[in-house]
Amino acid sequence: MILIYQFLSIVIGPLLPFYLKARLKKGKEDKLRYNEKLGKNYPATFTDKGNGVLWFFAASLGESKSVLPIINHLVSNGYKIVVTTGTLTSAEFLKNNLPQGAIHVFSPLDNTSIIKKFIKHFKPKALFLVEEELWPNLVLTCKSQGLKLVFLGAKFSLASSTKWFKYKKSFTYLLKQFDFIYTSAKYQGADVFDLCGVAYQKMDSLKYAQVAALTSNKSKKLDICCEDGFDIESKNSVVFISSHSSEEQIVAKAIKQISAKLPNFIALIAPRHIDTCSSLLQNLQSQGLNVVTLSSGQKVSSNHDVLIVDAMGLVPSCINTTGVSIVCGSFVDGIGGHNILEPAALVKPVITGEFNQNFDDIIDAMLESGAIIKSSSEAICGDVVKLFQNKSKYKEFATKANEFAMQKSQSHISLINKIINDIFNKQSN
């Protein structure tokens, strides 16, 4: 299978520029930088390579956020970092957040000659793969060029595992190219490594690594125009984070119920996608709720039940401004949940729904520690009211959530130090 893949990648190699130009027309590529994916127009490499150049191959925005604290740690210890990702959103995030000593480049396409150009230019000593997919040419080319290979947070979706097991021999061969494989301690699919006879070690979820960076947002508050005497922070307030269109009726109903039972209540909603705000507004108004949007510039007052935060990048400010954080994407099946660590890092009680496939390992651990509330869509109202009516319970959940997040955030630094020592010890043997 691998030989066929490599042959086909050579055959379609001349077509790759046309593929990227088609994506460019759809707005999916950076017009000034898309050639980086073809091994061209790279930024200047490091004049001083410090302790060595390390390559982090991350899929997209989520993976970029998860490895940023690790990158910061490595840079502070004298390493130079090249981070490659494939999406525009991840590129923008890294542009604004990478430390000096780290650079972002768009990921090379899975073509041997392109990958060799990348390695020749940047001269990395190791590849850290932070992906849910294996790229045969990437793995084999890096190995042949003498790089150490680390599969960090290794996991495969059910669809990916099913696909690869049709070619188990090739799958096993690729996995055995890695010097180190680390998978989440709670990853239920880890038996794929056992079935392939591949050695691996367990680690805490990479999502925990984000916590240290999130704590820097503690002082951010939402800049809201309010009527004289009205202050959201003094109210019983919640924020629904990353709500989806399929959850709008659930959110609207919950707010209606809470408003009827809890005095001085106001809800903020920071939807996952801004273009859903019009339908969200309609669903809220259909429940008889008085709604204002942040972009309207209208003053928020005690007459309002809901403030829709129809702007990007304000979730930390919303969390700090309100009392309880309700993390959406988890109240209907099929989405998989969103980041529950952000409100935990900011010392807020956290409520999430029943459908958190993407965060099951973290939520299970938080439930064991009494650090989160898992609620059905029908129980949101009751859980919110209980928190505001019982201040000691409110403080307990906020404190435990924060303690859990901070404790877990430290495990990755120790792990990375161990990996780096193992990599360079192996190279010196």
Which functions belong to the PLM regions below?
Residues 17-218, 222, 243-245, 258-262, ...:
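Active-site and donor-binding regions of nucleotide-sugar-utilizing enzymes
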Residues 178, 321-395, 402-404:
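Catalytic binding pocket for nucleotide-activated donors in carbohydrate/polymer assembly enzymes
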Residues 138, 247, 314, 338-339, ...:
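Conserved sugar-transfer catalytic core signal across GT-A, GT-B, and GT-C glycosyltransferases
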Residues 408-429:
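C-terminal alpha-helical cap of glycosyltransferases
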Residues 94, 98-104, 281-310:
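Nucleotide-activated donor-binding/catalytic signature segment of Leloir-type glycosyltransferases, i.e.
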Residues 114, 138, 170, 276, ...:
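Short acidic active-site motifs
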Residues 63-77, 219-297:
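Conserved catalytic-core segment of nucleotide-activated headgroup transferases in glycan assembly
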Residues 122-126, 304-335:
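Acidic donor-binding loop of glycosyltransferase active sites
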